Amino acid sequence: MERPESELIRQSWRVVSRSPLEHGTVLFARLFALEPSLLPLFQYNGRQFSSPEDCLSSPEFLDHIRKVMLVIDAAVTNVEDLSSLEEYLTSLGRKHRAVGVRLSSFSTVGESLLYMLEKCLGPDFTPATRTAWSRLYGAVVQAMSRGWDGE
């Protein structure tokens, strides 16, 4: 990724990473609003959540949010050399495939990520920042998609 884009990503992430659980919750609330069919994929100890609010307040799901935000943090840290995360992201893709996530759902996750960034950053979420994050997310999904391909 080009240096100016990397800097936009790092700069914006510094703001988000001050409250990762809060912003991660915004991301997943948006995800469930856009694609409610994903809610049943999140079950802990056999417990099916009755609503997005029920899911978003469960300690197990909050732990999942923390993990997702750590993956984003790793991508930001390695934004100029995502190949260092290739094996990990492919493995993460396999895990998501195994629990029934469709590869097509990652488009909605991307929309939700951009929504969260916009809500968090306000006017600092410029078109250039949006483009930079879209490119980073696309590269992450490309690596994760290898987990569906079996590569």
From Swiss-Prot:
Predominantly expressed in brain. Disulfide bonds: none annotated. Residues 1-149 form the Globin domain. Monomer. Homodimer and homotetramer; disulfide-linked. Mainly monomeric but also detected as part of homodimers and homotetramers. Interacts with 14-3-3 proteins; regulates the phosphorylation of NGB. Could interact (ferrous form) with G-alpha(i) proteins (GTP-bound form). Induction: Up-regulated upon oxygen-glucose deprivation. The lineage of its organism: Eukaryota, Metazoa, Chordata, Craniata, Vertebrata. InterPro entries: Globin, Globin-like_OT, Globin-like_sf, Globin/Proto. Keywords: Cytoplasm, Disulfide bond, Heme, Iron, Metal-binding, Mitochondrion, Oxidoreductase, Phosphoprotein. GO terms for molecular function: GDP-dissociation inhibitor activity; heme binding; metal ion binding; nitrite reductase activity; oxygen binding; oxygen carrier activity. Heme b binds at H64, H96. Its EC number is 1.7.-.-. Signal peptide: none annotated. It comes from Mus musculus (Mouse). It holds the Pfam family Globin. Monomeric globin with a bis-histidyl six-coordinate heme-iron atom through which it can bind dioxygen, carbon monoxide and nitric oxide. Could help transport oxygen and increase its availability to the metabolically active neuronal tissues, though its low quantity in tissues as well as its high affinity for dioxygen, which may limit its oxygen-releasing ability, argue against it. The ferrous/deoxygenated form exhibits a nitrite reductase activity and it could produce nitric oxide which in turn inhibits cellular respiration in response to hypoxia. It comes from the Eukaryota. Belongs to the globin family. The gene is Ngb. One of its GO terms (cellular component) is cytosol. This is Neuroglobin. Phosphorylated during hypoxia by ERK1/ERK2. Phosphorylation regulates the heme pocket hexacoordination preventing the association of His-64 with the heme metal center. Thereby, promotes the access of dioxygen and nitrite to the heme and stimulates the nitrite reductase activity. Phosphorylation during hypoxia is stabilized by 14-3-3 proteins.
